[in-house]
Amino acid sequence: MLEAPPLLLVAGGVGLALLALRWLATTDLQFFGRAFIVWNEFIMKPIRNLLMGSSKEQRILQHVLQHAVAGDPQSVVAAIDSYSLEKEWAMHVGEKKGQIVDRVLREQQPSVLLELGAYCGYSAVRMARLLLPGARLLTIEFNPDYAAITQRMVEFAGLQDKVTVVLGASQDIIPQLKKKYDVDTLDMVFLDHWKDRYLPDMLLLEECGLLREGTVLLADNVIYPGAPDFLEYVRGNSRFECSHFSSYLEYSKVVDGLEKVVYKGLSGPARP
């Protein structure tokens, strides 16, 4: 049986992609956002991976190693931004929303910061570069390849003394934070993993006694791809004080935003 050459498969894939985009790309912003993600993550990414023999995440790391300055976190952030803007779209928080993250972090000055979802380490490096002496960041990543790239990124930035990369599912690691990682309570949590895990993981943090009065949770992508159950819960519950920062999906014109949630303490049942 004859096998189709890779380029023929690619051409066929692109043809199917264009047909899919004709259906997805309407005037509805949600459909436009969906088309943007489908094109970049489910069409172009596997095509490039096939042709180049490496993953997008590996290419991002190589770009950083070649163009950033070792021990300079800001140059690492800038290199990732330039690659994701000019070469291949990637799901980092990005420069526009990153400035919001910077501002919140500077205001809070956390001693213990938890990140849910490391991906390639962009936000870990971005946040850790602003931490005060003695402060630390734990970042939980489920994908072992992403966790390894994050670890390499953190080490290249010279932040290995501030950042601990934890491999595993958030729902498995969160109950271990107190005993295994010596966490009493968290000053700040950055949520940027699976959007359907935002609400259950926040409630799990509360159940495990990791939230204190004044703990700040900053959730990315609450508009697109969206975390409607999370927003509905925190905005309708007296245990939380919410504020919204409107912005755009990383490296795009798709409307997005971050939600800042301040935990006011347990004044009612922890489950919706």
UniProtKB/Swiss-Prot annotation:
Cofactor note: Binds 1 Mg(2+) ion per subunit.
UniProt xrefs under InterPro entries: Catechol_O-MeTrfase_euk (IPR017128), SAM-dependent_MTases_sf (IPR029063), SAM_O-MeTrfase (IPR002935)
Pfam families: Methyltransf_3
Modified residues (Phosphoserine): 267
Coiled coil recorded as keyword: no
Single GO MF annotation: catechol O-methyltransferase activity
Residue ranges, Cytoplasmic side: 1-6
Binding site for Mg(2+): 192, 220-221
GO biological process terms, semicolon-separated: catecholamine catabolic process; developmental process; dopamine metabolic process; lipid metabolic process; methylation
CDD domains: AdoMet_MTases (cd02440)
Binding site for substrate: 195, 221, 250
SUPFAM superfamilies: S-adenosyl-L-methionine-dependent methyltransferases
Keywords: Catecholamine metabolism, Cell membrane, Cytoplasm, Lipid metabolism, Magnesium, Membrane, Metal-binding, Methyltransferase, Neurotransmitter degradation, Phosphoprotein, S-adenosyl-L-methionine, Signal-anchor, Transferase, Transmembrane, Transmembrane helix
A GO cellular component entry from the record: axon
Residues passing through the membrane, by range: 7-27
Family assignment from sequence similarity: Belongs to the class I-like SAM-binding methyltransferase superfamily. Cation-dependent O-methyltransferase family.
Function: Catalyzes the O-methylation, and thereby the inactivation, of catecholamine neurotransmitters and catechol hormones. Also shortens the biological half-lives of certain neuroactive drugs, like L-DOPA, alpha-methyl DOPA and isoproterenol.
Protein name: Catechol O-methyltransferase
Gene designation per UniProt: COMT
